Amino acid sequence: MSKICEICGKGPSFGNNVSHANNKTSRIWYPNLQKIKAVKNGTVRSIKVCTRCIRSGHVTKAL
């Protein structure tokens, strides 16, 4: 299961946790993906979409 938005292509970001002692450990930030039923290419499909795309209206939810 990929953690990528099917509309905008947003995926995981990589970086470091930094402690007060300046110790660094790598970590991953995942996008806030939601599984919704949406109309894509004229058919209703269940797709993974980030909340930014849902809020901005890039995807139309199926009723």
Curated annotation (Swiss-Prot):
InterPro entries: Bacterial_rp_bL28, Ribosomal_bL28, Ribosomal_bL28/bL31-like_sf, Ribosomal_bL28_bact-type, Ribosomal_bL28_sf. The keyword Ribosomal protein applies. GO terms for molecular function: structural constituent of ribosome. Keywords: Ribonucleoprotein, Ribosomal protein. The lineage of its organism: Bacteria, Pseudomonadati, Thermodesulfobacteriota, Desulfuromonadia, Geobacterales. Belongs to the bacterial ribosomal protein bL28 family. PANTHER family: 50S RIBOSOMAL PROTEIN L28, LARGE RIBOSOMAL SUBUNIT PROTEIN BL28A. This is Large ribosomal subunit protein bL28. One of its GO terms (cellular component) is ribosome. It comes from Geotalea uraniireducens (strain Rf4) (Geobacter uraniireducens). One of its GO terms (biological process) is translation.
